[in-house]
Design a protein with these regions (language model features):
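Structural beta-strand/beta-sheet cores of well-ordered domains, especially the beta-sheet scaffolds
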Residues: 24-28, 159, 218, 226-229, ...
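Divalent metal-coordination and catalytic microenvironments
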Residues: 29, 120, 167, 200, ...
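Glycine-rich loop-to-alpha-helix module at the N-terminal edge of alpha/beta enzyme cores
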Residues: 192-194, 202-205
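Active-site neighborhoods of metal-dependent hydrolases
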Residues: 1-193
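Acidic, glycine-enriched loop/beta-strand segments at the rims
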Residues: 139-152, 197-201, 209-243
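C-terminal cap of metal-dependent C-N hydrolases
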Residues: 154-161, 178-180, 230-277, 281-283
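Short loop/turn motifs at secondary-structure junctions and domain boundaries
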Residues: 105-106, 209, 254-257
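A general structural motif at alpha-helix termini
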Residues: 130-131, 204, 227
Length: 289
């Protein structure tokens, strides 16, 4: 389940509809992280649902895409498309993450809304003008869902909701969900006090272990596997946006989420992580369904 800005009542309505399923054992699931995606204007998938952007995917050469971005008719149609409800229509949720042109470096880290205000144009012109000025090499970060603190607090406090979501690396160049446990502990527990520390730990350990029938995990108890994370409650956390690395074959990129405040990790009683580094121990087992 995701919370969308354009559908403020969707979470409550959906949870109400699925209560009979929850009573039979079903569990809704959500990510405690704001869903943040990387967007390049050479592959503008985030806008693919808009009719005006169809041309961008018919001829994907740089010259053809640049011609579309310059076209006043395209910009006019895009503005019309944006009048329909859309989860990313708020330009304050789209940030210029990286540029190649030195002249545009001053805009890195600013939202499209901020760039538009500085230039005295609307969001459409700001987005497309900066893209053309950087020869379509710039990259944006889009905060799509789960960005409203009040509605997320309500969702996270619903004990029927399973915390944690991931795509198994299917979009490793666009997003990274693996930082959600440290984000919960740092943001939702310590900073915003939406969950108690004890409840947050339970929701991320014994709760999923019980759901999936993993009987020897999820608790610190004699006779169970010693899978333990030792952390500092005062410093544990992670950011809401992943970091980009270029360490895949051919220099391809992937997204990673860095953690803070993790002192040690044990898997089956062996220390696998200590003082910010892997120890080299491989004490886990592959789970097969």
């Amino acid at each position: 389940m995701f919370d969308r800005d354009d559908l403020p009542n969707a979470l409550r309505e959906t949870l109400a509809k699925v209560r009979p399923l929850i009573a039979r054992g079903a569990r809704p699931q959500t990510s405690p992280l704001p869903l943040t995606r990387e967007l390049t204007m050479r592959n503008p998938f985030a806008f693919a649902a808009f009719p005006s952007w169809k041309r961008l995917f018919e001829d994907t050469s740089k010259a053809a895409q640049a011609a579309v971005y310059r076209d006043p008719a395209f910009r006019k149609q895009f503005r019309e498309d944006l009048k329909r409800p859309a989860s990313f229509a708020d330009w304050a949720r789209i940030t210029l993450h990286e540029v190649t042109s030195p002249k545009l470096k001053r805009y890195e880290g600013k939202t499209v809304a901020e760039i538009a205000a500085e230039r005295g144009v609307d969001g459409v012109d700001a987005l497309l003008d900066v893209t053309l000025e950087d020869d379509l090499q710039n990259e944006f970060t889009v905060q799509s869902w789960n960005t409203r603190i009040d509605r997320m607090a309500e969702l996270l406090n619903d004990r029927s909701v399973l915390l944690g979501l991931g795509d198994g690396g299917a979009h490793l160049d666009m997003l990274c969900d693996s930082g959600y446990p440290t984000y919960v502990l740092g943001t939702w527990v310590r900073e915003r006090k939406v969950l108690t520390l004890e409840e947050a730990v339970r929701r991320m350990t014994s709760d999923p272990a019980d759901l999936f029938g993993i009987q020897d995990r999820g608790r610190i108890k004699p006779g169970l596997a010693a899978d333990i994370v030792i952390f500092d409650p005062a410093t544990v956390g992670s950011g809401g946006r992943p970091e980009r690395l270029h360490d895949l074959p051919g220099g391809a990129k992937r997204m990673v989420m860095r953690s803070r405040g993790i002192e040690m990790t044990l898997v089956n009683g062996e220390v696998t992580w200590e003082k910010g580094a892997l120890t080299g121990a491989s004490a886990g087992n592959v789970l097969r369904s």
